[in-house]
């Protein structure tokens, strides 16, 4: 049987081969998700699978992914994994891993794992995966730790497997240090399996096409993607465009500032002027910051090209050492998403005057809200699981924001039924909040109200990570702000980044923020206002007072 065409200069051949690589990453994604033990990996999809070339550059990424992983895995491979373990120090069956936040994704629960792929005795590529483990020891995932040493166990780049044999001492140390050893070990095994799938399928792909390595294909993919990104940048006017965003922070407000500097076919983002690092777990490390800088700009420049190294090269960023977006190595950062998730909105705001038709309003899912529920079951065994609560997406030039969406995280929510199996709670309410979306020509997505009741006989400790309680999500292009968030226990306000203890029968109620609007509310069509009224997404009062609507209003909307 003749070999398939391998002309990398032929766009059709290149696209077919490229899609095959993405499918390989998707196969591994499916394996990891289907075999993972913990809800945060299995249900929330808080993981990624990536194929890297022999230099550690991103070649193909699974279709469904967390944006932070766009740059994290290839940067970790190129800057840390490969220098410590070059190809001549690796053998088939080796698996490398670390959870060092300076190397991976900025916080300890994320484990970065890389497996060399051999063909004819030579390393031709690497399979990479990152997954958010359900526990890593230390303080439960929230915002109160004052340094990284309180947040859990940290292990450097190690050989988790050597020539296919597990390093049992390392596994023993990890399992002895966490609250959920079975789930943690199971998730690590799932990552190993996913990487093995990528390795096996890539070798089959190379054999099918008669290739010895991926070098030529990688060069074609990277150069095409980089050229496409640079072409899109050249369509924007040169200049420096600035913005700032005010956040709740932990106990004092945090200011994020950015200057987006466009010069010919490259973009540089400078975060000078951003608030200093803090003695709480909301510091955002360089790798996490850069990932969101790239993601935001890719959304505006070239959202269709699949993620790979070429998309990254034209974009750089920087932040002063010691600020909350470039903290010292010892600082805490387990809840770094409370800061990092806002970076895309900050960049959109800076570019509002450059590409108003492409930016969207600030999102209530930025950052994602999380409740880490920990305690003892009635039989004395321990449980622990994280539930996410999403706010409304910001509105866009052509569409309303989506309700309760986790932009920019792209995380799913653990199904209520699965969460109630993992944790002794009853979800009494889960509903959209009318009028929570920021008004505009296009309305911001709605936030939600969720009520959880402790059904267990023992107290439940809930560690909260939330934002936008004092500073709601802003609109763009004259759009209005969405509603702010709330956290309550039995009707009494709670500290949104603290620990809430629920005794038997007590309730936690959260109201997530609504997304910001796009365009002036006076420009919203009557048809859309009437549709919102009919679906109880806005009230009659809002229709009259905010949108200036004077048409008929059904009784249900009064």
Question: What is the role of each PLM region?
Answer:
Residues 96:
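Active-site Gly/Thr loop motif
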């Amino acid at each position: 049987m003749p070999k398939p065409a391998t002309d990398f200069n032929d766009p059709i051949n290149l696209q077919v081969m490229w899609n095959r690589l993405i499918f390989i990453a998707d196969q591994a994604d499916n394996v990891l998700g289907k075999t993972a033990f913990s809800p945060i990996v299995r249900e929330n999809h808080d993981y990624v699978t990536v194929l890297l070339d022999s230099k550690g550059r991103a070649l193909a990424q699974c279709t469904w992914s967390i944006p932070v992983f766009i740059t994290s895995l290839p940067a970790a491979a190129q800057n840390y994994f490969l220098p410590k373990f070059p190809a001549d120090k690796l053998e088939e069956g080796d698996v490398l891993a670390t959870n060092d936040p300076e190397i991976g994704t900025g916080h300890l629960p994320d484990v970065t794992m890389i497996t060399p792929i051999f063909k004819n005795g030579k390393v031709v590529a690497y399979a990479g995966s990152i997954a958010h483990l359900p526990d890593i020891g230390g303080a439960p995932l929230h915002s109160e730790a004052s340094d990284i040493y309180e947040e859990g166990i940290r292990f450097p780049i190690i050989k988790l497997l050597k020539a296919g044999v597990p390093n049992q001492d390392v596994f023993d140390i990890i399992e002895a240090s966490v609250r959920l050893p079975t789930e943690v070990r199971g998730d690590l095994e799932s990552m190993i399996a996913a990487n093995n799938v990528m390795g096996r399928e890539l070798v089959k792909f190379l054999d099918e096409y008669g290739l010895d390595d991926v070098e030529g294909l990688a060069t074609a993919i990277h150069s095409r993607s980089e050229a496409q990104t640079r072409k899109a940048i050249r369509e924007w006017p040169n200049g420096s465009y600035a913005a700032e965003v005010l956040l709740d922070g932990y106990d004092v407000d945090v200011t994020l500032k950015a200057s987006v500097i466009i010069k010919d076919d490259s973009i540089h983002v400078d975060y000078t002027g951003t608030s200093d690092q803090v003695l709480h777990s909301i510091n955002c490390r360089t790798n996490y910051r850069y990932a969101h800088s790239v993601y935001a700009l890719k959304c505006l420049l070239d959202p269709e090209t699949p993620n790979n190294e070429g998309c990254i090269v034209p974009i750089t960023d920087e932040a002063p050492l010691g600020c909350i977006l470039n903290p010292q190595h010892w600082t805490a950062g387990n809840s770094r998403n409370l800061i990092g998730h806002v970076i895309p909105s900050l960049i959109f705001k800076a570019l509002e005057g450059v590409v108003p038709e492409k930016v969207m309003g600030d999102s209530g899912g930025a950052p994602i809200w999380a409740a880490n529920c920990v305690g003892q079951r009635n039989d004395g065994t321990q449980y622990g699981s994280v539930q996410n609560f999403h706010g409304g997406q910001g509105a866009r030039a052509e569409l309303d924001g989506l309700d309760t969406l986790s932009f920019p995280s792209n995380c799913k929510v653990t199904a209520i039924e699965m969460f109630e199996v993992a944790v002794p709670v009853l979800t009494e309410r889960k509903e959209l909040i009318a009028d929570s979306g920021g008004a505009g020509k296009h309305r911001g997505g709605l936030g939600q109200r969720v009520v959880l009741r402790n059904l267990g006989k023992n107290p439940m400790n809930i560690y909260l990570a939330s934002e936008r309680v004092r500073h709601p999500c802003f609109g763009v292009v004259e759009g209005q702000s969405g509603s702010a968030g709330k956290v309550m226990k039995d009707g009494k306000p709670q500290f949104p980044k603290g620990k809430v203890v629920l005794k038997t029968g007590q309730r936690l109620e959260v109201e997530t923020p609504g997304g910001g609007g796009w365009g002036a509310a006076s420009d919203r069509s009557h048809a859309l206002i009437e549709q919102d009224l009919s679906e109880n997404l806005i009230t009659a009062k809002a229709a009259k007072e905010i949108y200036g609507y004077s048409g008929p209003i059904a009784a249900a909307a009064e």
